[in-house]
Amino acid sequence: MDSIISAASVIAAGLSVGLAAIGPGIGQGNAAGQAVEGIARQPEAENKIRGTLLLSLAFMEALTIYGLVVALSLLFANPFTS
C-alpha cells in the first residue's frame, strides 16, 4: 500500500508543477504582448509600462513557485507515507 501512495504522490507532484505553470505562462504571454503594444502606441510611457509589467510578472511567477512548493512537499515531506 505504501508503494501506491508513493506513486500517487509522484504523479500528483508532476501534475501540480505542470498545472501551476499553465496559467501563469498564458498570463505572462498576454501581459508581455499588451506591454509591447502599449509601448508601441506610447513610447514616452515606456518606463512606467515596463515597471508595471515586471511587477505583474513577479506576481504571476509566484503562482508557479507555489506549485513547486506543493510538489516538493509531496515528494519530500509527504504526510501520507509512514
Curated annotation (Swiss-Prot):
HAMAP family: ATP_synth_c_bact
Cysteine-cysteine disulfides: none
NCBIfam families per the UniProt record, alphabetical: ATP_synt_c, PRK07354.1
Keywords: ATP synthesis, CF(0), Chloroplast, Hydrogen ion transport, Ion transport, Lipid-binding, Membrane, Plastid, Thylakoid, Transmembrane, Transmembrane helix, Transport
PROSITE patterns for this protein: ATPASE_C
One Pfam family hit: ATP-synt_C
UniProt-recorded Gene Ontology molecular function terms: lipid binding; proton-transporting ATP synthase activity, rotational mechanism
Stated family: Belongs to the ATPase C chain family.
Subunit description: F-type ATPases have 2 components, F(1) - the catalytic core - and F(0) - the membrane proton channel. F(1) has five subunits: alpha(3), beta(3), gamma(1), delta(1), epsilon(1). F(0) has four main subunits: a(1), b(1), b'(1) and c(10-14). The alpha and beta chains form an alternating ring which encloses part of the gamma chain. F(1) is attached to F(0) by a central stalk formed by the gamma and epsilon chains, while a peripheral stalk is formed by the delta, b and b' chains.
More about this protein: In plastids the F-type ATPase is also known as CF(1)CF(0).
Cellular component GO terms held in the UniProt record: chloroplast thylakoid membrane; proton-transporting ATP synthase complex; proton-transporting two-sector ATPase complex, proton-transporting domain
Taxonomy, superkingdom: Eukaryota
Cellular location(s): Plastid, Chloroplast thylakoid membrane
Membrane topology recorded in Swiss-Prot or TrEMBL: Multi-pass membrane protein
Primary localisation category: plastid
Record's function text: F(1)F(0) ATP synthase produces ATP from ADP in the presence of a proton or sodium gradient. F-type ATPases consist of two structural domains, F(1) containing the extramembraneous catalytic core and F(0) containing the membrane proton channel, linked together by a central stalk and a peripheral stalk. During catalysis, ATP synthesis in the catalytic domain of F(1) is coupled via a rotary mechanism of the central stalk subunits to proton translocation. Key component of the F(0) channel; it plays a direct role in translocation across the membrane. A homomeric c-ring of between 10-14 subunits forms the central stalk rotor element with the F(1) delta and epsilon subunits.
Stretches that traverse the bilayer: 4-24, 57-77
Positions bearing the site annotation: Reversibly protonated during proton transport: 61
Record flagged with keyword Thylakoid: yes
Protein name, as recorded: ATP synthase subunit c, chloroplastic
Organism: Heterosigma akashiwo (strain NIES-293 / 8280G21-1)
CDD domains, per the entry: ATP-synt_Fo_c_ATPH (cd18183)
